[in-house]
Curated annotation (Swiss-Prot):
Reactions listed under catalytic activity: XMP + L-glutamine + ATP + H2O = GMP + L-glutamate + AMP + diphosphate + 2 H(+)
Function: Catalyzes the synthesis of GMP from XMP.
Domain GMPS ATP-PPase positions: 207-399
MF-aspect GO terms: ATP binding; GMP synthase activity
Keyword Ligase: yes
Protein name stated in the entry: GMP synthase [glutamine-hydrolyzing]
Gene, per the UniProt record: guaA
Active site, per annotation: 85 (nucleophile), 180, 182
UniProt-annotated binding residues for ATP: 234-240
Provenance organism: Nitrosococcus oceani (strain ATCC 19707 / BCRC 17464 / JCM 30415 / NCIMB 11848 / C-107)
Top EC class, one word: ligase
Keyword Ligase: yes
Pfam family, one: GMP_synt_C
């Protein structure tokens, strides 16, 4: 087996919400990478021995004495550097260039003129001007700008408002861009990053699913030994792939605990038991705990509080089950990178907390079981690739994501059994119709949301006053950003009529047309 860590890229984080997206792009190129804070210890930096370093963007200004700065060692290692947005600005500032707060900020789409010859941008373009200059369609998000190049650098890109939108020191292999090559809006962004990774840094594509599985199995066996591992199985993609990976690594030492918390989708409990216990031969303990969860959630309306309560009760159930089993010392979870990102629970802790995930923020400080998260460093697409490689069925691997707290975060405000029952039925109709009309695999995630408000309606000849549900469907590559799915009006009309006619207690159906950002995919 090739050493999948032999060629690696280091990403230094200045707090950008796009930092993990940079990592995803590097991984897509088949190269291992890690994210560390910009002020990581010099000893750790030397030990990591990267083939190249990428400096992320960030919300801070480079102008001022309190601006985050890099260790001078970064510039002395002799490895290529790529600064993105703030990363370019801080590189320029620390190497003797000049940076100012721009009077004209740039946010969103922009066209960049490619100047001169650069190894990084050679023969990469989206358009050309009448004079033959190469143009790139890019995504900008910055307030500061570089106005003076450090010694040894030349200009390689410009916009109308940022004459120095790109810079290069070819001798030292230092590069900087004011735009974001990691986002999909920058059309040639992946080509630019691959040029840096392969040609400038000399990395090879070693980060492949089969190698990841082999290394994960080795790590799991080393860490766990002969202990028994409990896995909280939800039936979603992440916990399902975690179960398959762990079962391949330790076999019967894995015991899956499936907790029916009363917040699952229609028929989900039966489906999970059929798939894992009967078809895959994995030992699954089915625990019915609806009353326990609903009692703990009674009167709670704050979404953060609900997530943490659901996480706490899950842990309590697992600990009680572990006490019944010999050698049960580990709690495994299907935590993946996006969970950690939105909880700002990664290695850097620089990003702002958007929402905590029950797999991360809901864990009590004193956990009586050791935590095992074999997918923690993987993105959703990598998890699906592993699932396919492990032989899981297509319909399971490519099932839409379902949050760990379940319907608890799809019921706005207080969670009640009545609300969950209504939502289950409405959601099942929506998903059924998506399958029937060949839309399910065309959208990335779809579900119904229960709104704790009532609306006047007319049923037959009488007035009714019942609840409202919202339908949500999005398209996304990475779940870091998403656009609302433009489902046909006739389809939405059909789904709405079915829900109102078949689910007693719902009188109105709405459709959510919010993108991410500014909205998150889940409502809570």
């Amino acid at each position: 087996m090739s050493d999948l860590y032999a060629h690696r890229i280091l990403i230094l984080d200045f707090g950008s919400q796009y930092t993990q997206l940079i990592a995803r792009r590097v991984r897509e190129a088949g190269v291992y990478c890690e994210i560390h804070p910009y002020d990581m210890a010099e000893s750790t930096l030397r030990d990591f021995a990267p083939r190249g370093i990428i400096l992320s963007g960030g919300p801070a200004s480079t102008v001022g004495e309190t601006a985050p700065r890099l260790s001078p060692l970064i510039f002395e290692l002799g490895v290529p550097l790529l600064g993105i947005c703030y990363g370019m600005q801080v590189m320029a500032a620390q190497l003797g260039g000049r940076v100012e707060v721009s009077a004209q900020r740039e946010y969103g789409y922009a066209q960049v003129y490619v100047h001169g010859h650069s190894r990084l941008l050679q023969n990469i373009e989206d358009h050309t001007t009448a004079g033959g200059e190469a143009l790139l369609d890019v995504w900008m998000s910055h307030g500061d700008r570089v106005i003076g190049l450090p010694e040894g650098f030349k200009r390689i890109a410009a916009t109308a408002h940022a004459p120095l939108a790109g810079m290069a020191d070819e001798k030292r292999r230092f590069y900087g861009f004011q735009f974001h090559p990691e986002v999909t809006h920058t059309r040639q962004g992946i080509r630019i990053l691959e040029r840096f990774i392969y040609d400038i840094c000399g990395c090879e594509a070693l980060w492949e699913p089969r190698h990841i599985i082999a290394k994960s199995i080795e790590n799991i066996r080393t860490k766990v030994g002969a202990d028994t591992v409990l896995l909280g199985l939800s039936g979603g993609v992440d916990s399902s792939v975690a179960a398959a990976l762990l079962h391949k690594a330790i076999g019967d030492q894995l015991i899956c605990v499936f907790v029916d918390n009363g917040l699952l989708r229609q028929g989900e409990a039966d489906q999970v038991m059929a798939t894992f216990a009967r078809h895959l031969g994995i030992k699954v303990i089915h625990i019915s705990a609806e009353t326990r969860f609903l009692e703990a959630l009674a009167g709670v309306i704050d979404p953060e509080a609900k997530r943490k309560i659901i996480g706490r009760v899950f842990i309590e159930v697992f600990e009680e089950e572990a006490a019944k089993l010999p050698n049960a010392q580990w709690l495994a979870q299907g935590t993946i990178y996006p969970d950690v990102i939105e909880s700002a629970g990664g290695k850097t802790g620089k990003a702002q907390v958007i929402k905590s995930h029950h797999n991360v923020g809901g864990l009590p400080e004193e956990l009586n079981l050791k935590l095992l998260e074999p997918l923690r460093e993987l993105f959703k697409d990598e998890v699906r690739q592993l699932g396919t490689e492990l032989g899981l069925p297509f319909e399971l691997v490519y099932r839409h994501p379902f949050p760990g707290p379940g319907l608890g975060v799809r019921i706005l405000g207080e969670v009640k059994k009545e609300y969950a029952d209504l939502l289950r039925l409405a959601d099942a109709i929506f998903i059924e119709e998506l399958h029937a009309h060949d839309w399910y695999d065309k959208v990335s995630q779809a579900f119904a949301v229960f709104l704790p408000v009532k609306s006047v309606g007319v049923m037959g000849d009488g007035r009714c006053y019942d609840f409202v549900v919202a339908l949500r469907a999005v398209e996304s590559v990475d779940f870091m950003t998403a656009r609302w799915a433009h489902l046909p009006y006739d389809f939405l009309d059909h789904v709405s009529r079915r829900i109102i006619n078949e689910v007693a207690g719902i009188s109105r159906v709405t459709y959510d047309i919010s993108g991410k950002p500014p909205a998150t995919i889940e409502w809570e």
